């Protein structure tokens, strides 16, 4: 990830009272292909980091479907091709959520995400 994105991640984490937790380019996220369709809002939630999995799950639309095949694994280094607007949120720690749309941003803590 480039230096500007890392600085933006730290700024967002700090502004919202969170510790910055790195998400390496070599790590994986769970993502739905619908993020490439221009659907809003875009949502992200972060479970604890396990191995090479960042804990991030990202999807577009209001609700997260319960379908087991909803998320596909993707290395963070490819997110710039899929959904570059989420990169600046990937420094939020496990137990965080975000939702973004045109001129809208919401970031909050959800400790239930830590109980996985």
Language-model regions, residue ranges each:
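Extended, charge-biased low-complexity segments
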Residues: 1-14
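Alpha-helical protein-protein interaction elements
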Residues: 10-12, 48-51, 81, 100
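Short helix/strand-capping turn motifs
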Residues: 14-66, 74-77
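Substrate-binding/catalytic groove segments of enzymes
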Residues: 65-67, 97-98
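Short, compact, well-ordered microdomains
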Residues: 75-116
């Amino acid at each position: 990830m480039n230096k500007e994105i890392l600085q933006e991640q730290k700024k967002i984490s700090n502004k919202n009272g969170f510790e910055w937790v790195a998400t390496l380019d070599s790590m994986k996220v769970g993502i739905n292909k619908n993020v490439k369709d221009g659907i809003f809002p875009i949502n992200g939630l972060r479970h604890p980091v396990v191995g090479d999995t960042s804990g991030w799950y990202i999807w577009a639309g209001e609700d997260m479907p319960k379908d087991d095949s909803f998320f596909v694994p993707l290395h963070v280094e490819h997110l710039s091709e899929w959904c570059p607007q989420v990169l600046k949120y990937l420094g939020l720690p496990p137990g965080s959520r975000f939702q973004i749309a045109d001129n809208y941003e919401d970031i909050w803590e959800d400790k239930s995400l830590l109980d996985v």
